[in-house]
C-alpha cells in the first residue's frame, strides 16, 4: 500500500492524548493542529525547491526557496478544518480550498454538498486533508474533485487511517501518496476506525 506512517515519539504521545475519551475539544483542536504540522514536515518533502542567490552579512551564497504560492490546501469539511492551520503555519502563502462531503449513514456512500477551490494547474501541489481515513469513500470523492479541477500532484494527509480505507484510495488513486500518524486495526460495522478516536468532527466542534 502507498502509505507513509510518520513514526515519531511526539506524534505517538500527542495522538494517545487525542484518543482518550476525556480529552476536551480545546485540547483536541490544539493537538490536531500540532500533529498535522509534524506530519506535514514529512509530507512537504515532495515540494520542489528553487535555487537562488542571497547575501549573508559576510558574503554572497547559494540558497533555496519553496514557492508556496503553488501549494493548495484542501480540507474536507468539517473535520479537515482542524488540520488547515498546521500546514499553513509551514506554508503561509498557500491557497486554501474547501470540499464538503458527508457519508450517507445507511449506504456509507460519499455525497458532495460543497466545493470551492482556488485555481489549480499541473504545477500545483495539492494537499487534501481528512483526519480519519475510514471507508475511504470521502477521500476518494475529494481526490476525484481536485483532479477534475486540474490537480496532478496530490498528497492525502490524514491523522488515522484504516487498512480498508487505504486500499480503497490506493485502488482508485494509485498515484496519490498517503501520509498518516497511525494505521489502525480495522473498521467496525458502522464504518468507524478501531481503536480510532471516535468522530473527529464531533470532538472538534462538540456537536455530541
UniProtKB/Swiss-Prot annotation:
Cofactor descriptive note: Binds 1 Mg(2+) ion per subunit. The magnesium is bound as Mg-PRPP.
One GO process term, biological-process aspect: uracil salvage
Activity regulation (UniProt): Allosterically activated by GTP.
Pfam families reported for this sequence: UPRTase
Membrane-spanning intervals of the chain: none
Domain of life of the native organism: Bacteria
Cofactor: Mg(2+)
SUPFAM superfamilies: PRTase-like
Top-level EC class: transferase
Reactions listed under catalytic activity: UMP + diphosphate = 5-phospho-alpha-D-ribose 1-diphosphate + uracil
Family assignment from sequence similarity: Belongs to the UPRTase family.
Protein known as: Uracil phosphoribosyltransferase
Organism: Thermosipho africanus (strain TCF52B)
